[in-house]
Swiss-Prot record:
Principal localisation: periplasm
Protein's gene: mdoD
Pathway terms, separated by semicolons: Glycan metabolism; osmoregulated periplasmic glucan (OPG) biosynthesis
GO terms (BP aspect): beta-glucan biosynthetic process
Keyword line: Periplasm, Signal
Family the entry assigns: Belongs to the OpgD/OpgG family.
Classification via Gene3D superfamilies: 2.70.98.10, Immunoglobulins
Posttranslational mods: Predicted to be exported by the Tat system. The position of the signal peptide cleavage has not been experimentally proven.
Native species: Enterobacter sp. (strain 638)
Top-level lineage group: Bacteria
Chain's role: Probably involved in the control of the structural glucose backbone of osmoregulated periplasmic glucans (OPGs).
GO cellular component term of the entry, any: outer membrane-bounded periplasmic space
GO MF term set: carbohydrate binding; catalytic activity
Name of this protein: Glucans biosynthesis protein D
């Protein structure tokens, strides 16, 4: 695992993999224009054609690193790159009256070096035309770009695209595909957050991580009033190729993507990640180590949620560990999983720049049988909010061999809340802090003599109120140490129950402690399962130090 390379990819600041060699795959024919910016000649296209392209491409060697950009683009600063704006009057569907959707393209430059080709597709005739780069499509403003270096560069291509929805057809985008195979979407807050990827390769292995590229896109022309659009894309990398179909529903409160992919392995792959997503967790209620700012919490996502194939619901709060951690949660035919941002209270963040309280959750819903495998979760130490440090994906159990063909179908929900929740009680929040004293008697002059760590897990919903008179039983499992001072408290402000317990070490090990808890009433589970990973301090640090200065 090359951490530097991963961080570059997670920021989508560099396209790190292959060219497509598509020039030999397109013929020339007449075409009836469906977009007035498409200027290429036509070729028949549909999803089966794309699958054949990806299959054939996998039989050839990878095309290698991207070619150099013109110097005026290669040396751009982020500020200069952001100054380049697409001309909204030349958007993909600007000639369609009463359109509800539109598409604009990102310019090449800075870290975005991989040429991406764009095509307009008339689905009625199955004819596609390429949209070639030309400087007239962009406004360069104060970017300092020497446009003379771009003249005659029709094969320069684009870096990616973004989609807009009425009434914000040219001002606030709702979907963005930019860099490698990264893409994002928003809910009704118009606030971007975590990202998804087309594919992850060797994220946590003894070889450098590989970042496949989306190298070409085909856009089906929308009709007036449509709020759904379809785009096809070709994926390429040293180890694999892929044909993808995205049907993107731009609803009022969320964006839903139906994804179909067909994958063709060039090489053996140690670790294949399906439907990967990338997020950031610097600090939160449960992890305060990096929160010495005015902001109580800083994160794009607060938990990994899983709906296992056997019906069990899992809540796993995220961490910012002191060293890289990778966990694999085994499953068979999962019903869904995702990185969620469920805490939407502004007062918990106090951030008017990042607006973390508005960031969307991302939920994956498999649409075919995925078989045996695991949900992989990687957490990387970070000292701030500018680098993504959380990765999540589905890893098939069966190793991928050269020549293998795979297909996965799934839905992605970009929304404030996932489309489904457990009917049982849900985890509301997780907190940790000093332990070893009675709740309500925080140490004053005398600190506890025995060191312990307290955990408070809040549950809401389900049948908690009905279960309370019968008796609620926390079922706690630990990989090491002991749980003591277990308490169950009703908390009126959020109308739920808080489970308290103190973790006491029983040896000097500093290995991560895997914790598991659910609530039971008369033998039946009444809550989803809470999972957590705690990192105990070294034995010589397991003491309380009173560093107060009495004045």
């Amino acid at each position: 695992m090359n951490r530097r390379r991963f961080l570059q990819g997670s920021l989508a600041m560099a396209a790190l993999s292959g060219t497509t060699g598509l020039s030999t795959l397109f013929s020339r024919a007449a075409f009836a224009a469906d977009s007035d910016i498409a200027d290429g000649q036509s070729r028949r296209f549909d999803f089966s054609v794309l699958q054949s392209m990806a299959h054939d491409l996998a039989q050839t060697p990878w095309g290698g690193a991207p070619r150099p950009l013109p110097n005026t683009l290669a040396t751009m600063t982020p500020q200069a790159y952001n100054a380049i704006q697409y001309d909204a009057k030349q958007s993909l569907w600007n000639n369609i009256e009463d359109r509800q959707l539109d598409v604009q393209f990102f310019h090449m430059g800075m870290g975005f070096r991989r040429r991406v080709r764009m095509f307009s597709l008339d689905s009625a005739s199955s004819q596609a035309r390429e949209i070639h780069f030309r400087p007239e499509l962009f406004n360069y403003n104060d970017a300092g770009v020497d446009t003379k270096q771009l003249e005659g560069q029709s094969d320069l291509g684009f870096a990616g695209f973004r989609a807009f929805k009425a009434p914000e057809l040219a001002r606030r985008d709702i979907v963005s595909f930019l860099g490698a195979s990264y893409f994002r979407a928003v809910d009704d807050t118009y606030q971007y957050g975590l990202s998804a990827r087309g594919l992850a390769i060797d994220t946590f292995t003894d070889t450098p991580e590989e970042f496949p590229d989306f190298t070409s896109f085909w856009f089906e022309t929308v009709k007036p009033g449509d709020t759904t659009f379809t785009v096809y894309t070709l994926l390429d990398s040293p180890s694999i190729t892929g044909a993808y179909k995205f049907v993107i529903h731009c609803e009022k409160s969320q964006v839903i993507m139906e994804v179909d992919n067909h994958l063709y392995a060039r090489k053996d792959i140690k670790q294949l990640g399906i439907s990967p997503m990338t997020s950031m967790f610097a600090c939160g209620n449960n992890e305060r180590r990096m929160c010495d700012t005015i902001h109580p919490q800083i994160h794009d996502s607060d938990r990994l949620a899983m709906w296992r194939g056997n019906g069990e619901w899992i809540c796993r709060p995220l961490n910012n560990p002191q060293k890289l951690q990778f966990n694999a949660y085994q499953d068979k035919n999962p019903k869904g999983f995702g990185l969620l941002q469920l805490d939407r209270d502004f007062s918990h963040y106090q951030d008017i720049m990042g607006w973390y309280n508005k960031r969307p959750s991302l939920w994956v819903e498999p649409r075919n049988q995925w078989g045996k495998g695991s949900v992989g979760l990687m957490e990387i130490p970070t000292t701030g909010e500018t680098l993504d440090n959380v990765v999540c994906f589905w890893q098939p159990e069966k190793p991928v061999k050269a020549g293998d063909e795979l297909d996965f179908k799934y839905r992605l929900y970009w929304s404030a809340q996932p489309p489904v929740r457990s009917p049982l009680a849900n985890v509301y929040a997780t907190r940790t802090g000093m332990g070893g004293f009675p709740e309500g008697w925080a140490p004053g002059e005398n600190y506890p003599k025995t060191w312990a760590r307290r955990f408070a897990i809040d549950f809401v919903g389900g049948d908690l109120k009905a279960a309370a008179p019968k008796g609620i039983e926390p079922v706690i499992t630990l990989s090491n140490g002991e749980a003591r001072q277990v308490e169950i408290l009703y908390v009126e402000p959020f109308d739920g129950y808080r489970i308290l317990f103190d973790w006491y070490p029983t040896n000097d090990s500093t290995d991560p402690i895997d914790m598991r808890m659910f609530l039971r009433c008369q033998g039946d589970a009444i809550s989803e399962t809470w999972l957590y990973q705690y990192f105990p301090p070294a034995p010589d640090k397991r003491v309380y130090v009173d560093d107060r200065v009495m004045r």
